[in-house]
Amino acid sequence: MEANNRRDFLKKAALAGASALMAPTLLAAEGKDESEFVLSPSKRTDSKLIVPKNNGLKITGTFLDEISHDIPHQNWGEKEWDLDFQHMKRIGIDTVIMIRSGYRKFITYPSKYLLGKGCYMPSVDLVDMYLRLAEKYNMKFYFGLYDTGHYWDTRDMSWEVEYNKYVIDEVWNTYGEKYKSFGGWYISTEISRNTKGAIGAFHTMGKQCKDVSNGLPTFISPWIDGKKAVMGTGKMTREDAVSVEQHEREWNEIFDGIHDVVDALCVSRRTHRLR
């Protein structure tokens, strides 16, 4: 009986999958528009939400994760990005942040400086595209600085400062003075602890961003090197995690050294055991 039930389930699942794949073809053959079968605003389930509409905490900004450490690059053209911006606008997003303008040899715009350092020529100028789409949908775009990759290899932050002092000037001269949607800067170097040289590096990059752009806002995204920060280790927890108290002490020191050139922070991933 159990085997028969399993076979029946598999047959039904296969038929359901085939139906889903065939639906667009059948609709096209009948001359029907797929959009007829998309939920319209009047058919949505807003009235059944546990938190009534507009009473929840609003999310108005999001990252554009085009060049990432561990997420594959999006194989999107401008049409797909335009649709994504439309969706973001509809749900209340008014700020988009490019998480980084490049990582090691992959870059998002044809930077003369970075190409001269051996980076690959991008097929599309993503920075220009994002800025145009941000203007089209009345959003603000934050530019994420370049990540050399050297910090992750050596824990030496001087590489980030050296490369980005050219990137910041180059980007502002190319895009900042051209687009009103250029709204600020994201200092993309992510740290958890008071790493040697961190305060000086963040201050130098933040100050240059503000100086060239007449004071546009800057922000960072720190994380906590907590007990569950185990990505890539094969472990569930770690014993050498920073305590919440030590984390607070170190970040008080960091903030004290950068508060005049860094305006805000967006707390990044990683978790710590609740007490």
Each language-model region and where it sits:
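Positively charged, low-complexity intrinsically disordered regions
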Residues: R7-D8, T45
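Residues in flexible loops and secondary-structure boundaries
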Residues: G17-A18, E34, P72
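Short, cationic motifs built from Arg/Lys/His that form the positively charged side of catalytic pockets
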Residues: R6-R7, K210
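N-terminal export signals
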Residues: E2, D8-E30
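Basic/polar N-terminal segments that are highly enriched at the extreme N-terminus
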Residues: M1-E2, L27-S47
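Glycan-processing catalytic domains of CAZymes
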Residues: P41-R275
